[in-house]
């Protein structure tokens, strides 16, 4: 009887174990599948976009632990101003930019807490733009930003009790939002099934590529822009503007957290046409809490960095404006805060990303045809040439040799105007056609991922019905302009970076963009 009882009890225990294993397996499998769905449905903003928040936050988790001495937080102003690459290359200081579009101080606070799980920064630099009401023409909640902006920052945070706390806080401040949807993203993004694209299935490779330590590289200028910075005397006579309620509450929390952790907190405001009223309010707060405040809208500081609103842009500086602010802060961090240089090989990778982004920007500013062709010697570029009409009469030997150097092989001098020429040359090889006949040529680049098509159809009797088309990844790039029409596709950013016409029927060889 004893053996029978033991056998029966053992059988029951075995059934319980099997049941437990099945339950655990089910939970793990369900969690894995939900995680996959969440990752797939989550909107992606990679290094090849204007505001690359996906790379910003997922790249952060790839950093070596305790490898960052300075953290930057703030809005899009901070994203395109504080350049960790420039600070490292100049001063050897390791830093990371955790800013995002319209970053609420609530989000800044929770991302600072998240960052402190992995890093032990000596200094935190906080952009103060979002301390004040973001705009008058927006339906604002107490987050002082849109839901989309909150999610761009919070979707990238790893699931944890802290993220759940942040989600509940956000939902309390803005009752239109669901706390649970910050952990289970499919609740918010289930409708994206019909809009999924390549980016939704290549997250691992895009994160492996990496960005520029959270910095976004932008170009552009504002010819004729005039900005008169205010003086400290202007601020002394001004009435301080009130901070946005929730923003001040969470500024207090950030200040207290930094003090508790022994971190030096620096307040900043980048060149953005800010007011002396805001300066006075922020400076009063900074002085009351023993914090340094650098407002680059104040005349002496604006002059010190030789900032120029027309050349460097306000609010969202181009990369040259960002370099000016970053050089200044780097000197402050090294000199006044004693942040020492240290070697970090990861900056070699981010330097390559930054250099390539700058090359793309400078390419779009070149107007000399010879200089332009010389700048196309980049292994990431695929060059499309579309010449549907007259193109040959003024092609010089020098220009032709530059085309040969780029890898094109067809002689284009002394070609009758009745000929058409199309070509594509890049990492996937060379394809060319020079013919009097109509053209229909299709192919793909990036290993078959990105399609293109040349189409010249003059079969209709009336010229108005003729077709002159070049499509690259569904973007129409065709034109009937005389000369050589060039489309530059960057395989690194997976995008068209420039389109120009070099009028090789004009001896002056004018270069224009279209």
Predicted regions and their residues:
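Acidic-and-aromatic substrate-binding clefts and catalytic sites of carbohydrate-active enzymes
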Residues: 102-106, 243-245, 271-278, 392
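Membrane/wall-proximal cationic-aromatic binding patches
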Residues: 31-94, 104-114
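Short acidic-hydrophobic catalytic motif
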Residues: 360-382, 386-514
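Active-site segments of SGNH/GDSL-like serine hydrolases
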Residues: 254-275
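C-terminal regions of proteins
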Residues: 277-348
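Membrane-embedded segments
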Residues: 73, 77-161
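Secreted/periplasmic serine-hydrolase-like ester/acetyl group-modifying domain
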Residues: 142-261, 341-357
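N-terminal Lys/Arg-rich, disordered targeting/topogenic segments
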Residues: 1-19
């Amino acid at each position: 009887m004893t053996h029978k009882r033991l056998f029966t009890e053992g059988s029951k225990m075995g059934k319980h174990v099997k049941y437990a294993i099945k339950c655990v397996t089910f939970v793990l499998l369900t969690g894995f599948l939900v995680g996959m769905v969440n990752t797939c449905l989550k909107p992606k903003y990679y290094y090849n976009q204007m505001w690359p928040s996906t790379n910003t936050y997922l790249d952060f988790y790839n950093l070596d632990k305790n490898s960052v001495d300075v953290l930057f937080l703030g809005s899009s102003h901070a994203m395109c101003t504080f350049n960790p690459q420039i600070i490292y290359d100049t001063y050897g200081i390791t830093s990371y930019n955790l800013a995002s579009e319209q970053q609420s101080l609530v989000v800044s606070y929770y991302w600072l807490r998240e960052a402190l799980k992995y890093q032990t920064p000596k200094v935190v630099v906080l952009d103060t733009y979002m301390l004040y009401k973001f705009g008058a023409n927006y339906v604002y909640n107490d987050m002082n930003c849109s839901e989309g902006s909150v999610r761009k920052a919070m979707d990238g945070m790893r699931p944890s009790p802290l993220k759940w706390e942040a989600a509940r806080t956000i939902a309390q401040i803005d009752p239109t939002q669901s706390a649970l949807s910050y952990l289970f993203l499919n609740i918010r993004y289930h409708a994206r099934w019909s809009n999924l694209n390549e980016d939704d299935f290549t997250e691992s490779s895009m994160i492996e590529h990496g960005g520029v330590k959270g910095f976004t590289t932008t170009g552009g200028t504002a010819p004729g822009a005039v900005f008169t910075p205010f003086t400290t005397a202007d601020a002394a006579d001004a009435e301080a503007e009130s901070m946005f309620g929730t923003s001040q509450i969470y500024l207090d929390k950030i200040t207290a957290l930094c003090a508790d952790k022994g971190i030096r907190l620096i307040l900043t405001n980048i060149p953005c046409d800010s007011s002396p009223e805001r300066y006075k309010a922020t400076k009063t707060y900074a002085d009351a809490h023993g914090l340094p405040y650098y407002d680059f809208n104040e005349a002496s500081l604006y002059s010190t960095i030789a900032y120029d609103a027309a050349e460097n842009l306000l609010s969202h500086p181009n990369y040259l404006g960002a370099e000016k602010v970053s050089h200044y802060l780097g000197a402050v961090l090294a000199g006044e805060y004693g942040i020492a240089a240290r070697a970090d090989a990861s900056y070699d990778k981010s330097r390559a990303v930054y250099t390539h982004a700058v090359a793309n920007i400078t390419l779009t500013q070149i107007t000399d045809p010879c200089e332009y062709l010389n700048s196309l010697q980049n292994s990431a570029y695929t060059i499309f040439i579309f010449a549907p009409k007259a193109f040959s009469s003024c092609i010089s030997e020098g220009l032709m040799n530059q085309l040969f150097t780029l890898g094109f092989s067809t002689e284009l001098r002394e070609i009758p105007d009745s000929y058409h020429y199309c070509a594509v040359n890049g990492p996937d090889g060379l394809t060319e056609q020079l013919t009097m006949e109509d053209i229909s040529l299709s192919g793909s680049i990036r290993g078959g991922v990105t399609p293109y098509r040349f189409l010249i159809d003059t079969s209709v009797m009336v010229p108005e019905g003729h077709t002159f088309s070049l499509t690259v990844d569904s973007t129409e790039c065709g034109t009937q302009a005389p000369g050589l029409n060039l489309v530059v596709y960057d395989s690194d950013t997976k995008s068209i970076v420039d389109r120009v016409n070099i009028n090789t029927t004009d001896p002056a060889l004018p270069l224009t963009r279209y």
